[in-house]
């Protein structure tokens, strides 16, 4: 019998994106999935629309915007009927109907795999990769998506161990997620997914990229199109938290210098591109 899955979609004032995501989830082929929408105190009529259009999906309503980590943790904890596996999925995605099976198959066949994550494409450029695995070097101050903005090719067609699973879509055994302590709620947004993977790896776990599982992410594939000062600030706060938490104390000063240097380069580069696009 197929292992049971609880799938969580976090929503905050993202009605249209969430409705599209749920529409794709209605078509999934895995036989034993329960879909939950965690609403972070939305004010855009999301809850009513979801209830009307997707009555089979359960809504967990939180009183305010708890952010990514706390919101997902709270929704997960409020579900009394735990499943064998837990999947967290961004609301700004659409999924392949078959995306669940490869993730569960890999988790069931190898107990050392603690997280499985799919190949993720840009929704506005269907053959181009947004996430083909993750690579981390906190000592040098960088965290990278492998394959980002590259056209899909055979090099991204094989299972492989990676440094982290993106929170955009990650599958775990429920007991593993609970025993590791869930998401660290000191991360409001950005960095919590990398932190979770690092904690699993520090305990000897593997993070597996599973390209047979496919989803599409609704972010722009254009360089600089996604840039905002607020996002840049939050990402770098998350990165500094990761450095402070996961590397040796004597490495922290040099790592912070490199992080600040590369972050300022990113800021200048992205701001320049953004200005040129407005001309």
Question: Predicted regions span which residues?
Answer:
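Acidic helix N-cap motif at the loop->helix transition within catalytic regions
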Residues: 19, 44-52, 61
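Glycine-rich, basic loop-to-helix element that forms the pyrophosphate-binding segment
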Residues: 61-81, 91-93
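Conserved donor NDP-sugar-binding/catalytic core segment of glycosyltransferases
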Residues: 93-131, 136-138
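A short, conserved alpha-helix in the catalytic core of glycosyltransferases
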Residues: 163-214
């Amino acid at each position: 019998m197929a292992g049971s899955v609880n799938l969580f979609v976090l929503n905050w004032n993202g009605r249209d994106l969430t409705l599209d995501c749920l529409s794709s989830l209605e078509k999934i082929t895995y036989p034993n999935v329960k879909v939950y929408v965690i609403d972070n105190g939305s004010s855009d009529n999301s809850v009513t629309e979801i209830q009307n259009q997707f009555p089979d999906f359960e809504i967990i309503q939180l009183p305010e915007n708890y952010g990514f980590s706390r919101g997902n943790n709270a929704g997960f904890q409020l579900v009394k009927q735990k499943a064998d596996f837990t999947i967290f999925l961004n609301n700004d995605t659409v999924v392949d109907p078959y995306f669940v099976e490869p993730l569960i198959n890999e988790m069931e066949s190898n107990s050392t795999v603690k997280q499985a994550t799919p190949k993720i494409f840009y929704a506005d450029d269907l053959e181009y990769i947004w996430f083909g695995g993750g690579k981390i070097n906190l000592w040098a101050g960088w965290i990278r998506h492998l394959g980002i903005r590259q056209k899909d090719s055979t090099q991204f067609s094989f299972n492989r161990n990676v440094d982290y699973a993106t929170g955009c879509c990650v599958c775990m055994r429920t007991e593993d997620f609970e025993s590791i302590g869930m998401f660290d709620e000191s991360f409001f947004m950005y960095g919590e997914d990398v932190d979770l993977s690092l904690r699993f790896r520090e305990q000897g776990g593997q993070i597996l990229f599973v390209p047979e599982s496919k989803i599409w992410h609704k972010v722009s594939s254009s360089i600089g199109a996604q840039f905002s000062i607020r996002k840049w600030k939050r990402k770098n706060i998350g990165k500094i938290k990761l450095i402070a938490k996961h590397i040796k104390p004597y490495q922290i000063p040099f790592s912070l210098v490199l992080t600040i240097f590369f972050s300022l380069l990113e800021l200048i580069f992205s701001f320049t591109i953004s200005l040129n696009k407005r001309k």
